[in-house]
């Protein structure tokens, strides 16, 4: 199991420090680190780590880790912060529903971050490619929701 744990740590470090867009690229990086594995094994590892793909700053889709296991990236901003700062377009309310519009490819990762924060205002989210529907708790005001979201999406105000 130690070999697998080391391999999973290597995968997390590579994904956290480089823009990797395919399993083939990741296999090459792992090979340079001394790990020899098949594409099927890598696929299982990525599933276990809950790795997803998200649009990078240059529009290329790259692997990203869920926030609870995110390693420090090289640079001033994490990928999550970059997504939040550059992917958000608008926020609108209607009754107990709010809708966030994003750039294409950004909604899923934003919804993931919203869902993984404790909130007195939001019950949950449903995300598409460029739209997030938020179901608000009874009595949640747009001001309170906007304040909560500003903790996750800095340029929402």
Curated annotation (Swiss-Prot):
Primary location: cytoplasm
Database matches in SUPFAM superfamilies: C-terminal domain of arginine repressor, Winged helix' DNA-binding domain
Biological or metabolic pathway of the protein: Amino-acid biosynthesis; L-arginine biosynthesis [regulation]
Range of residues in the leader sequence: none
Keywords: Amino-acid biosynthesis, Arginine biosynthesis, Cytoplasm, DNA-binding, Repressor, Transcription, Transcription regulation
One GO term of the biological process aspect: L-arginine biosynthetic process
Any GO CC annotation of this UniProt entry: cytoplasm
GO molecular function annotation: arginine binding; DNA binding; DNA-binding transcription factor activity
Coiled-coil residues: none
Alphabetized Gene3D superfamilies for the sequence: 3.30.1360.40, Winged helix-like DNA-binding domain superfamily/Winged helix DNA-binding domain
Subcellular location: Cytoplasm
Record's function text: Regulates arginine biosynthesis genes.
Family: Belongs to the ArgR family.
Entry protein name: Arginine repressor
Organism: Bacteroides fragilis (strain YCH46)
């Amino acid at each position: 199991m130690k070999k697998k744990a080391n391999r999973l740590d290597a995968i997390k470090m590579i994904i956290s420090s480089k823009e990797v867009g395919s399993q083939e690229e990741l296999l090459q990086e792992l090979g340079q680190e001394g790990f020899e594995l098949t594409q099927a094994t890598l696929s299982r590892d990525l599933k276990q780590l809950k790795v997803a793909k998200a649009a990078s700053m240059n529009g290329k889709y790259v692997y990203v880790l869920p926030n609870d296991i995110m390693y420090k990236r090289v640079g001033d901003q994490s990928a999550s912060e970059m997504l939040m700062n550059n992917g958000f377009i608008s926020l609108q309310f209607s009754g107990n529903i709010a809708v966030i519009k994003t750039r294409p490819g950004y909604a899923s990762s934003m919804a993931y971050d919203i869902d993984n924060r404790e909130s007195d205002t939001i019950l949950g989210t449903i995300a598409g490619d460029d739209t997030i529907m938020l179901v608000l708790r009874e009595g949640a005001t747009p001001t309170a929701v906007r304040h909560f979201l500003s903790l996750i999406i800095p340029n929402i105000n």
